[in-house]
Amino acid sequence: MDAISYERAGDVAGAVRAAQQPGAVFIGGGTNLLDLMKGGVARPVRLIDITHINGLDTVTTLPDGGIRIGALVRNSDAANHALVREQYPLLSQALLAGASAQLRNMATVGGNLLQRTRCGYFYDTAFTQCNKRTPGSGCAALDGRNRTHAILGASPQCIAVNPSDMSVALAALDAVVRVSGPAGERTIAFADFHRLPADRPDVDTTLRPGELITAVDLPPPLFSAHSHYLKVRDRASYAFALVSVAAALQMDGERVQTARIALGGVAHKPWRASAAEQMLNGQPLSQATLKNAAAAALSDARPQHENRFKVQLAQRAIVRAVNHAAARDGGVA
């Protein structure tokens, strides 16, 4: 077993300083990190425990009417918080669709943002071809088992998908990630937080070395009355999405004022279906228009030999999610 040192950070500045040491990583709930360590995928030499930093485990209202969710808020607490349930039911649904109750009780919002892919070739170090684990080694999934892999935004270097349900909802809601690092504090628009693989699939996010996620900000609630998170998976119990859809609408009678649609399980990052949104904005919500919008969302899909079904599955999921969102009257069941 590798030797690992441990340090408990007392504040954000101390955590950032400690993270400058080679091989240091932050640990909150640790639900994903421990899996990676046990499998030999992650080999940190120093763990920086951030769970005792005050002020990162609260949900607060912002002056503009939005909310701030601290990075250390547990997934279960975020999902069941009154402000989230009432004003951002889409996020509550997505959080409750992820993992198991036990994992949600331990996992943090900040850690959820940093989940690594669940690609089997990434997790099994017996497979030496994995550009995400070892850049330049190849991608075993391209010619292997790729039923669960990406159909949008992939590259010849990597076809893995992002596994986070929460992140799909945050993408649709135009969240902002707050971070603190050696150069100070900054914010990252959610659309810019996760990366497509390109030629560096080992880099999942746009975080700079040593930066710590401190919170996620949500804009004022515009979609509390009409939103829905739909997750399609192989079994009803704990499973990652084959396809998921976060749909959020502002409705004026039968007309869509504003549509926000994000997809999960189809790309290296939560995928905003901008083409579908544009086709729905300002239009009456007819089924013909909705089906055309769903087709537009997948027009650039490039499926692999085992996951061609995902294209039609995603289109149908968009139709279902948007129809459900349009009929919804707010809140979480």
Regions found by a protein language model. Give the residues of each.
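C-terminal structural segment of proteins
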Residues: 1-333
